[in-house]
């Protein structure tokens, strides 16, 4: 992107109206720009042909569309594609496109690295390098080659979305607004380890689905796996969820990586049943994908199936998530731009 120019991508309609008003353009120009951006996906201001040439030149003096193409991609044998996107700060983030029949999900990142330092996650080993701007986040969708095929977006890539909440909310607003992508909020899922105050604000200000990283119902063990337990316990997260209605369109899910010999016992299953009693939710069981220098191991398929069956039998809707893109380090817990830099894969 050009220096000293503001990206138009991720600007709200009100912001576009204010920007064009300051440049002396007609009142309706902001809405025209929004249609070019979010309706047509233009790459250059000169493509906005119903703006006069004089107004396009005014706009170009201060703004640019802001779309940045991925600089690298890797394709898995299962069809999953991992893209490497540049950011305004000069850093890079990974984004994963997951086709599945007539559905296509995009897993987007909200930060470069992550502060949460979960034991089992490669992104946490990268450390925290900074928040993405709203334009950085939305660009992962805006500049995706398969953009027109997308049916869902999940904020489950690099970073903790609640730790960059202002920008995440801005992006979900643009995605769901009539002037924007005009998506239903039920096409969007935002994940979190549980961040005090931020999680409540997200629930209040958004209608998108929410996915909570549980990984253990036992506080001491969860704290060992996820230091964020000390900031907001899983019990506090569940108590907060009881204040909201998940019986209609909005969905609540708990993510649970199953580690062999650690959190895969029937004791854990019973504790989950007790923990979520009376809460409309689902549990997604996830296979652990081995990362370097971490002494954790995945549970067997048989163990995962019996765990799922126990939860289901006791009224907790439970699925085993299919792993995708493991061969290109695109599966759950494997994203790390630092790993790509060190291996010389970045171009």
Place the predicted regions along the sequence by residue.
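Conserved AdoMet/S-adenosylmethionine-binding subsite of the radical SAM
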Residues: 145-152, 157-321
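Ferredoxin-type iron-sulfur electron-transfer modules in oxidoreductases and energy-metabolism complexes
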Residues: 135, 139-147
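Generic beta-strand structural signal
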Residues: 81, 93, 104-108, 116, ...
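P-loop NTP-binding catalytic core
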Residues: 89-98, 102-103
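Auxiliary Fe-S-binding modules of radical SAM enzymes
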Residues: 1-93, 242-250, 258-347
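Short linear Ser/Thr-Pro motifs
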Residues: 76, 109-110, 191, 213
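Canonical Radical SAM [4Fe-4S] cluster-binding loop centered on the CxxxCxxC motif
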Residues: 99-136
């Amino acid at each position: 992107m050009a220096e000293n120019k503001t990206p138009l991508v991720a600007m709200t309609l009100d912001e576009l109206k204010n920007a064009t008003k300051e440049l002396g353009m007609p009142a309706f120009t902001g809405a025209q720009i929004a249609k070019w951006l979010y309706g047509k996906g233009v790459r250059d201001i000169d493509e906005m042909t119903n703006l006069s040439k004089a107004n396009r030149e005014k706009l170009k003096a201060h703004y640019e569309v802001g779309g940045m193409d991925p600089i690298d991609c890797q394709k898995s044998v299962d069809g999953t594609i991992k893209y490497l996107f540049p950011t305004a700060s000069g850093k890079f983030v990974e984004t994963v496109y997951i086709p599945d029949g007539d559905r296509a999900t995009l897993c987007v990142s909200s930060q470069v690295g992550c502060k949460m330092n979960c034991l089992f996650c490669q992104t946490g080993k990268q450390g925290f390098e900074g928040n993405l701007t709203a334009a950085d986040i939305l660009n992962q969708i805006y500049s995706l080659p398969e953009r027109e095929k997308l049916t869902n977006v999940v904020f489950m890539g690099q970073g903790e979305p609640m730790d960059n909440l202002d920008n995440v909310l801005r992006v979900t607003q643009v995605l769901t607004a009539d002037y924007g992508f005009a998506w239903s909020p039920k096409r969007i899922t935002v994940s979190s380890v549980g961040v005090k105050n931020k999680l409540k604000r997200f629930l209040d200000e958004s209608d998108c689905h929410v996915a909570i990283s549980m990984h253990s119902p036992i506080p001491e063990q969860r704290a060992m796996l996820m230091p964020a337990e000390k900031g907001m316990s899983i019990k506090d997260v569940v108590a907060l969820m009881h204040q909201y209605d998940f019986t209609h369109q909005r969905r609540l899910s708990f993510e649970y990586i199953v580690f062999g010999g650690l959190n895969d016992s029937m004791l854990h299953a019973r504790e989950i049943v007790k923990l979520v009693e009376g809460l409309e939710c689902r549990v997604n069981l996830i296979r652990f994908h081995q990362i370097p220098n971490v002494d954790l191991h995945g549970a067997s398929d048989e163990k995962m199936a019996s765990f799922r069956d126990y939860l289901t039998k006791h009224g907790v809707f439970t699925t085993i998530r299919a792993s995708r893109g493991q061969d290109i380090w695109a599966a759950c817990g494997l994203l790390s731009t630092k790993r790509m830099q060190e291996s010389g894969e970045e171009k």
